[in-house]
Amino acid sequence: MTPDDKTGGSIRFAPRGVPVIIGVNRVGLFALYMKEVRRFLKVQTQTIWAPAFTTLLFLVIFTVALGRQGREVLGVPFASFVAPGLIVMAMMQNAFANSSFSLLSGKMQGTIIDLLMPPLSPGELMAGILAAAVTRAIAVGLAVALAIGLWPGVSLAMTHPWAVVWFGLMGSLLLATLGLATSIWAEKFDHNAAVTNFIIAPLSLLSGTFYVIENLDPVFQWVSRLNPFFYVISGFRYGFLGASDMGPGTVLMAAAVGLLVLNAVLAAGVYALLRSGWKLKS
C-alpha cells in the first residue's frame, strides 16, 4: 500500500536497487560544471588576467634578453617563435591548477561530501571537473593571446588552425587529468604545491618553449623527446608558424595521436581511482 499525497495521488518510489536516473545525469553534470566555472570566475583577476600579465612579462624579458638584433628562429622573429609556446604553457598550467583544487579544497574544508553525495557517477564527476578546467584553460589562452598581441613585433596569424585547436585541447586535457589525479592523492595543499613546483613547472620550462631542441646536446634532445609537454608546445607552435622542431609531418601526426592515447590512458586511470573511492571515501 502506498501513502497518498495531499493532492489525492500516490507517492511511488522505484524498487530498491533500480536507478531513478537512467543514462547521463545531464542536469547534475551541468550543475557541477557551472559550479566549477563560477568558482574560478569569482576571482578572475587571479585565475585569468594575472596569468596573462605574467606571461606577457615572460615575453618581454626573453625578447629583450635574447631577441635583439633581429634574431630569427624557425624563420620567424624570436618574439613570434616564443609567443605560441607561452600561450599553451599558460593554458596547461591553469588547467592543472583548476582541477587540482577541486577535490582537495573539499577535503581540506570538509565539504567533499557535497561532491560525493549527489547522484553523479564517477564518470560524470570527472567530466564536469575536467570540462571546467579546460574552459579555464581556453579563457586563459585567449587572455594571454590578447596580452601578447599588444607587444610589437609579435604575429599570431594561424597557418594550421586545426593544430592550434587540437594540441591546445590535448595539452589542456592532459594537465587537467593530471590535476584531478593530484587532487585525489593530495591530503593537504603542500602536496599539491609539491607536484606543481617539482613536476609541472620543470616539465613546462624544459619543453622547448624558449628554444629549439636542435641546439641541445643529443642526450638532452633525447630527454626532451620523452617530455609530453614538448609535443604539445611544438604542435601548438606548428599551428601558428607552419614549422616546428618536432620533425617531419609524420612525427607531428604521430604526436597528435599519441597525445590522444595518453589522455585516454590517464583518464581511465583517474576514473578507476574515482570509482574506488581511494582517499575520498576512506
What is each of the regions a protein language model found here?
Residues 2-162, 166-282:
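Hydrophobic transmembrane alpha-helices and immediately adjacent juxtamembrane helices
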